[in-house]
Amino acid sequence: MRSKYIVIEGLEGAGKTTARNVVVETLEQLGIRDMVFTREPGGTQLAEKLRSLVLDIKSVGDEVITDKAEVLMFYAARVQLVETVIKPALANGTWVIGDRHDLSTQAYQGGGRGIDQHMLATLRDAVLGGVRPDLTLYLDVTPEVGLKRARARGELDRIEQESFDFFNRTRARYLELAAQDKSIHTIDATQPLEAVMDAIRTTVTNWVKELDA
């Protein structure tokens, strides 16, 4: 079976780390063991430095990161990851399991920040080319639920400190994009943990079986 790219998406506190573990466990049970794991922003030395710049509220002192500068920083990190990790892995027959990818930018910057969607799509197509996830699991939670979980983990980063209105706009854009793309599967992540895990297992298992059909 040709290698695939699976991405896990969602608001802060949606449970992406747990979801990744379930995806890996499910794939292994299906006989798929050659995998690499990525996170965005990050995943390479350069991308991790960009991650610190864009997420650490103290990284640039009192200087405000403009919305468009933020977009370009995310894309710089993403391109580095795609070119140096994701593309080589897929070409080598290795499956890639990602914590976030371009859907995050379309939702957070396009929805939350209100940046022109055409500009974001044009930038995506120009710098990422044909690299797209084969399957995206969008873990849907309300900002109230997600941020409560995130705050329980400790100090919030620059994005996590945004307003509920910002996250409501981000969630709305996520749902809008998920409704338009059959490769994006929405999981109700407000359910009890075991129910969420079962939904992920079922989705991944059925999807892989369809690949074999």
Swiss-Prot record:
InterPro entries: P-loop_NTPase, Thymidylate_kin-like_dom, Thymidylate_kin_CS, Thymidylate_kinase. GO terms for molecular function: ATP binding; dTMP kinase activity. It is an enzyme of class 2 (transferase). The keyword Nuclease does not apply. GO terms for biological process: dTDP biosynthetic process; dTTP biosynthetic process; dUDP biosynthetic process. GO terms for cellular component: cytosol. Its EC number is 2.7.4.9. It comes from the Bacteria. ATP binds at residues 10-17. It holds the Pfam family Thymidylate_kin. It catalyses: dTMP + ATP = dTDP + ADP. Keywords: ATP-binding, Kinase, Nucleotide biosynthesis, Nucleotide-binding, Transferase. PROSITE patterns: THYMIDYLATE_KINASE. NCBIfam families: DTMP_kinase. Phosphorylation of dTMP to form dTDP in both de novo and salvage pathways of dTTP synthesis. Belongs to the thymidylate kinase family. This is Thymidylate kinase. The gene is tmk.
